[in-house]
Amino acid sequence: MDHSKQQNASITQAQAEEAVRTLLRWAGEDPTREGLLDTPRRVVEAYGDWFSGYREDPHDYLQRTFEEISGYDEMIVLRNITYESHCEHHMAPIIGKVHVGYLPNGKVVGISKLARVVESYARRFQIQEKMTAQIAACIQETLSPRGVGVVIEGAHACMTTRGIHKRGVSMVTSKMLGTFREDARTRAEFLQFIEVGTNVMDL
C-alpha cells in the first residue's frame, strides 16, 4: 500500500516537540536553557520539510505528457539532479546526484517533473538502493517508455561522520529497465552521457 499521502494524525506537533526535548535530555542537555528553547519547534519544522515526500505521490508529477514531439524517439537524459535525503538506519544525511534517462514511446514529460519525482522520493527516510529502484519504477509505470535508466551517486553521513569515519567515499547505484537493461549499446550510451564520477563532496 502507498502511504505517501498519509500523515500520522495521532501524533501532534506538541508530542513531536516533546520527543525532541527527550533526545536533548538524553544527550545531556537542558532543553529549558535559552539557546535550546525554540530548538524542538525548529527541528519539527525542519522534519516537515526534509520528509515532505511522504505527503506526495511521485506518479502525479508524470501525468501530464506531450505527444507532439515530431517523431523524436531518441534518448532523453537529465544529469546531475542534486538531492538531499536521510538514511533510514541512522537518520543521517545522504547528499548526492541522480542521473535519469529514458527512451520515449510516443510521449515525453516536462524535464522539471523528473526532478520532482527525484525530490519526492529523496524527501523520505531512504536507503540508496531502494530510492534508485523507486525512481525507475515510477517512470516506467507512468510513462511506459521503451526503457529507463537511473544512476544515483551519494555521500552518506552515516559513514563519514560516525562508525568507520571514511570521508570522500561515495556510493553508486543503478537500475536499468527495458532496453537499458536488455541492450548493452543503449546502456553504454546512457552511461557515456552521464559521465559518472563527479565528486559529490563538491556539492
From Swiss-Prot:
Disulfide cysteine pairs (residue numbers): none
Protein EC: 3.5.4.16
Catalytic reaction equation(s): GTP + H2O = 7,8-dihydroneopterin 3'-triphosphate + formate + H(+)
Keywords: GTP-binding, Hydrolase, Metal-binding, Nucleotide-binding, One-carbon metabolism, Zinc
UniProt: Zn(2+) binding residues: 87, 90, 158
Involved pathway(s): Cofactor biosynthesis; 7,8-dihydroneopterin triphosphate biosynthesis; 7,8-dihydroneopterin triphosphate from GTP: step 1/1
Entry-linked Pfam families: GTP_cyclohydroI (PF01227)
Enzyme class, UniProt record, top EC level: hydrolase
Database matches in PROSITE patterns: GTP_CYCLOHYDROL_1_1, GTP_CYCLOHYDROL_1_2
Gene3D superfamilies in the record: 1.10.286.10, 3.30.1130.10
GO annotation (BP), single: tetrahydrofolate biosynthetic process
Gene Ontology molecular function: any one: GTP binding
InterPro entries the record matches: GTP-CH-I_C/QueF, GTP-CH-I_N, GTP_CycHdrlase_I, GTP_CycHdrlase_I_CS, GTP_CycHdrlase_I_dom
Cellular component terms (Gene Ontology): cytoplasm
Subunit structure: Homomer.
Family: Belongs to the GTP cyclohydrolase I family.
Protein name: GTP cyclohydrolase 1
